[in-house]
Amino acid sequence: MVASRAIGSLSRFSAFRILRSRGCICHSFTTSSALLSRTHINYGVKGDVAVIRINSPNSKVNTLNKEVQSEFVEVMNEIWANDQIRSAVLISSKPGCFVAGADINMLASCTTPQEAARISQEGQKMFEKLEKSPKPVVAAISGSCLGGGLELAIACQYRIATKDRKTVLGVPEVLLGILPGAGGTQRLPKMVGVPAAFDMMLTGRNIRADRAKKMGLVDQLVDPLGPGIKSPEERTIEYLEEVAVNFAKGLADRKVSAKQSKGLMEKLTSYAMTIPFVRQQVYKTVEEKVKKQTKGLYPAPLKIIDAVKTGLEQGNDAGYLAESEKFGELALTKESKALMGLYNGQVLCKKNKFGAPQKTVQQLAILGAGLMGAGIAQVSVDKGLKTLLKDTTVTGLGRGQQQVFKGLNDKVKKKALTSFERDSIFSNLIGQLDYKGFEKADMVIEAVFEDLAVKHKVLKEVESVTPEHCIFASNTSALPINQIAAVSQRPEKVIGMHYFSPVDKMQLLEIITTDKTSKDTTASAVAVGLKQGKVIIVVKDGPGFYTTRCLAPMMSEVIRILQEGVDPKKLDALTTGFGFPVGAATLADEVGIDVAQHVAEDLGKAFGERFGGGSVELLKLMVSKGFLGRKSGKGFYIYQSGSKNKNLNSEIDNILVNLRLPAKPEVSSDEDIQYRVITRFVNEAVLCLQEGILATPEEGDIGAVFGLGFPPCLGGPFRFVDLYGAQKVVDRLRKYESAYGTQFTPCQLLRDLANNSSKKFYQ
């Protein structure tokens, strides 16, 4: 039973998610003038306790790089050599961040696995010295303690953390395609148990402080303080330091012990893991789960398992060696380069490159309380924006308000909010059927039906009741913004803000500017999106913008493949097997067959035969029979409420029978089907950069992965071209062009890169 429980606790293992970085606030501190020569780490002495403060300048977060490591070793050597110091406290001067991790840019210059492995070994040696410190060191944690930051903390003799939402602990290296390389794979299993350690390392999930305490990852919690003469953050940090200093004194005086007693279940699990058979069963179960979920596309999880297994079965020395070697191997893989590229792209897309807007948006108004409008309202009020939600019917408005409340209440169930906080946030939302209050609106976002006439109508109405400075943003997914703005009296204030469904889950926001959109309007739209917690790309106006324009030719190819006789389940298996989180046929059902038809027709008119392939007639017939996808319960699949299982909709065969296309054997292998889907997407993405729709490859990759589910392991269409090779992409396109024509003709920019192997999107 104990063995099954140890294995069962791994059931929380989830599929890959993308790392969300946390912003941190700077906080000043005082230190002795003799120590000011150090940039990142200084210390002062309180009685016989050294208080080591980490504070990387000109950065919102503390990260571990070679300079920080050098200063840390220098400081620790001084402390160990000073007989007046008997213990130490390690604390950050940034209230929202302990240490956010190691600086991944250290790996950028590595050209061999051995170079990367040396970086791992240096970290291991530093933390081993800390672990064996003759003077106890207490880690005082407030804010994010991630990656190398957690490895630093668990090498200390004791850990105290603030019990608030900003304090999270985790090892997200797997999300970057690598593993914890400074001893994490060896210390974590001993500290929290093998099942919990696997769960942390294989998912990269963040652990909140209260949960970390129950796991044994943190030894003591400190409640945050409220406001006083100083801010709550400053008061909490000072209190945390005071508690940590007192405990460090107690450790040095041997009045308290760093060893925590384990509960019965922890003792039973630890005992079970001493039995070789149980350990082998755990390894086997975890490996099988990893292989099933990653489909062999991500090498890091299996290497994490190997490193842990080596340490447990062969001892510490072998474990640390395995960790550093596997870290070096992973750092040079295409997958890690792709995932690190996405991380860097995310950081770029969370900044407002258009500067601060002249006027901050304080009052937001949203037109349309449907799925999208209510979703936009939820992410707005959740971040403190006062929001008006207008609809034309009482029923529609009520449904929208209920959706917002449910979204907030779900957070209460997950203990992310209290019921008081939920009600306070919900009070920021005012629902109405008229334009009352719009005279104070700084921005109006319309989420009405995708019909140009309807959008023209509401634009005119909005401009008649809002102030001159008010921005009008359209949440259209395909209609050109310049066409919407054609009836505007203030075209410089009109912009596109394309959200993705479900709005509270999807991170991407695609902002679309016309030739007349002012820079200040763009800056305001980006500022609102960032406040809503979005990752933002800004693109030029045009049919389909960037994301819908890339999706349309890919979906056209999907329809053709279905017409050629590949059933939806096989197509889904092939596309998820290539790295898409959702299969192609399932994606069509999720988007909505009616929406797919609408987009296919509009973009078909705009781009002609190049967007051809599959017959739009298939979509039309499905819509006529009410097969709209998940929202209607039937699409390519049949969906049942409350059930994750789905069966093929056999009635689709009756529709397809008159639309069958003969498959071409030379381009119909499983691999060809995968590359037909991916290359049409990639070619269109590169063409968007060529035409100036996209400003940078980074935004193109972020938009594709975060908005459309392009395989994260490939890093986005532009990173894929760099890693796979432009010439190979062009060769693939030429092969399919010979079978299908101009739909696969490679764009000029791709051909240019193929002709010059030294040119890449990322130099």
Curated annotation (Swiss-Prot):
The modification N6-acetyllysine is found at residues 46, 60, 129, 166, 214, 249, 289, 295, 303, 326, 334, 350, 353, 406, 411, 436, 460, 505, 519, 540, 569, 644, 664, 728, 735, 759. The record marks E151, E173 as: Important for long-chain enoyl-CoA hydratase activity. It comes from the Eukaryota. GO terms for cellular component: mitochondrial fatty acid beta-oxidation multienzyme complex; mitochondrial inner membrane; mitochondrial nucleoid; mitochondrion. It is found in: Mitochondrion; Mitochondrion inner membrane. Transmembrane segments: none annotated. Pathway: Lipid metabolism; fatty acid beta-oxidation. GO terms for molecular function: 3-hydroxyacyl-CoA dehydratase activity; 3-hydroxyacyl-CoA dehydrogenase activity; acetyl-CoA C-acyltransferase activity; enoyl-CoA hydratase activity; fatty-acyl-CoA binding; long-chain-3-hydroxyacyl-CoA dehydrogenase activity; NAD binding; NAD+ binding. It catalyses: a (3S)-3-hydroxyacyl-CoA = a (2E)-enoyl-CoA + H2O; a 4-saturated-(3S)-3-hydroxyacyl-CoA = a (3E)-enoyl-CoA + H2O; (3S)-hydroxyoctanoyl-CoA = (2E)-octenoyl-CoA + H2O; (3S)-3-hydroxydodecanoyl-CoA = (2E)-dodecenoyl-CoA + H2O. The record marks H498 as: Important for hydroxyacyl-coenzyme A dehydrogenase activity. Its EC number is 2.3.1.-, 4.2.1.17, 1.1.1.211. The active site is at E510 (for hydroxyacyl-coenzyme a dehydrogenase activity). This is Trifunctional enzyme subunit alpha, mitochondrial. The lineage of its organism: Eukaryota, Metazoa, Chordata, Craniata, Vertebrata. It comes from Rattus norvegicus (Rat). Residues 1-36 form a transit peptide. In the N-terminal section; belongs to the enoyl-CoA hydratase/isomerase family. In the central section; belongs to the 3-hydroxyacyl-CoA dehydrogenase family. Keywords: Acetylation, Fatty acid metabolism, Lipid metabolism, Lyase, Membrane, Methylation, Mitochondrion, Mitochondrion inner membrane, Multifunctional enzyme, NAD, Oxidoreductase, Phosphoprotein, Transferase, Transit peptide. Mitochondrial trifunctional enzyme catalyzes the last three of the four reactions of the mitochondrial beta-oxidation pathway. The mitochondrial beta-oxidation pathway is the major energy-producing process in tissues and is performed through four consecutive reactions breaking down fatty acids into acetyl-CoA. Among the enzymes involved in this pathway, the trifunctional enzyme exhibits specificity for long-chain fatty acids. One of its GO terms (biological process) is response to insulin. The modification Phosphoserine is found at S231, S419, S650. The modification Phosphothreonine is found at T395. The modification Omega-N-methylarginine is found at R399.
